[in-house]
Structure formats: C-alpha cells, structure tokens
C-alpha cells in the first residue's frame, strides 16, 4: 500500500496494521510518528528509510521500537514492513480502549453490528452525529476517507479529540 500523508489526512497506523508493506510519503514536522506506531503495538515492524534529506544518502533499516525518539525532519519516503499484518478489518473495539470522559459508549457488540450494516469502504466520507466510538471505528475503517464527527457538548468534543489523538487518526473533523 502506498500512502501520501503530505496532501490529505491519511491514517498511518490502521494502514500499517492491515498491510504487510506500506510505503509512506511524508513531510517534515511529524515528531511522534514512530512513537505512535510503537504505542499501537507495531514496535516489531521494520522501517526502511533514507538517512538524511539527500536522495543519494544511505538506506537504513530499524525496528519501530528502536525509533520511538525520532521524528521526521525532512520530506521523506519510508517503507514499513509488518510481518504480522491482518487482512481483515477490526470492528467492535472494547470500550476499555477508548478514553473516558463525559461520553457513554455504546456496547462494542452493538457498535460492531452498526459498523457492519454501514459497509464503510476505505475511501468513504461519513458524518456521525453523537456517536463518538462509532466515529472512531469508522475512521479506522475508512483511512482514505473523512469522518465528520458532530458533537454538541464541549466536554464530548474534548473527549472525542482525546480519542482521535489516542488512536492516531488524521481523518476525523470534529464540529
């Protein structure tokens, strides 16, 4: 899979989770990308990258767990190899994995049925009103699409922002 996270909000973590190889094009200023990958359980993945900003620099490789203190300081491309990639979507995430706050989450079993009925595709754009955990899981299922999460309460919006950050999502817009 090839993703370019310089132009549109793309989710690196779910893409790496579900593909054996992911080529990521990125720009400077992403300070915690490797920490986020490691935090999502992808520390054993191997990263192949060019050392430095010149195209003729040496190609190096390291495991994500050895790069958690590094960031991206130049436009770059990197190949991430995940030998444990899954080829199915994960739905029905347990409520214990979501950040707590003012939100009452629907049960994971009910959420799994709702998401199954929605038949979300990778490039879908979806609007979710007052369904925080559904918005998060939809964003994971549609890493190349956009999820608009409508939250009426300021405290619910804050919790939603925490969950977006916690899951490393770039394709959620909260209004």
Residue ranges and their predicted role:
Residues 123-132:
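Conserved class I S-adenosyl-L-methionine
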């Amino acid at each position: 899979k090839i993703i370019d996270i310089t132009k549109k909000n793309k989710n690196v973590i779910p893409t790496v989770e579900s593909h054996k190889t992911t080529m990521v094009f990125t720009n400077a200023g992403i300070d915690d990308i490797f920490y986020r990958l490691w935090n999502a359980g992808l520390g054993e993945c191997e990263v192949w990258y060019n050392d430095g900003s010149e195209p003729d620099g040496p190609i190096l490789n390291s495991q994500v767990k050895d790069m958690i203190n590094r960031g991206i300081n130049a436009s770059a491309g990197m190949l991430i190899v995940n030998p444990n990639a899954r080829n199915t979507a994960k739905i029905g995430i347990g409520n214990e994995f979501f950040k707590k706050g003012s939100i009452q989450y629907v049960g994971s079993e009910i959420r799994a049925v709702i998401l199954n009925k929605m038949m979300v595709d990778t490039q879908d754009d979806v609007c979710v009103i007052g369904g925080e955990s559904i918005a998060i899981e939809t964003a994971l299922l549609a890493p190349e699409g956009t999820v608009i999460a409508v939250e009426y309460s300021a405290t619910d919006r804050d919790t939603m922002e925490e969950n977006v950050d916690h899951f490393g999502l770039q394709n959620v817009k909260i209004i």
